[in-house]
Amino acid sequence: MLLEKVYLIDTNVVLRFLLDDHATFSPKAKRFMQAVFNKERAAALPAVALVECVYVLEKFYRVPRSDIADNLSRLLTYPGIVNSDKAALLKALKLYLQSGTDIVDCILAASSSEHSPIVSFDKDFRKLRAHTETL
């Protein structure tokens, strides 16, 4: 049963959950995420926290893109995750895996549409087949 309260998950909770590398925090993160998985708690993973997770996992821990995309996608599909931008974030993680482009550009590309084009000088958006307009 979902409660009215929606928890915003910070990067450090996701990292401790995925990496299981801290004697105190990892078990707490696992219990919280299990409650989200069981729909005992409602939570959202803000895009900014997802971006930071990708950056830390990729640059500091040297986790392969495929593992990053797979683990974060799986987390976003937990039954208690209630992000309004869930579809865009899942699409962004797929683009991140397939394109080799940074996650911020992938989120922008996944969120763009014919009626919400991206304005950028960055040529990576062509690779992502995003709706863009040049200045």
Language model regions located:
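Short, well-structured N-terminal submotif of metal-dependent ribonuclease cores
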Residues: M1-L45, F60-D67, L128
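Short beta-strand scaffold positions
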Residues: I9, A44-L45, N83, I103, ...
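Hydrophobic helix-cap positions at the C-terminus of alpha-helices
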Residues: A35-V36, L75, L95
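Short, conserved alpha-helical segments within structured domains
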Residues: P46-A49, A88
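Active-site-proximal, substrate-binding regions of enzyme catalytic domains
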Residues: V54-Y78
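Active-site neighborhoods of divalent-metal-dependent phosphate/nucleic-acid chemistry enzymes
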Residues: P79-P117
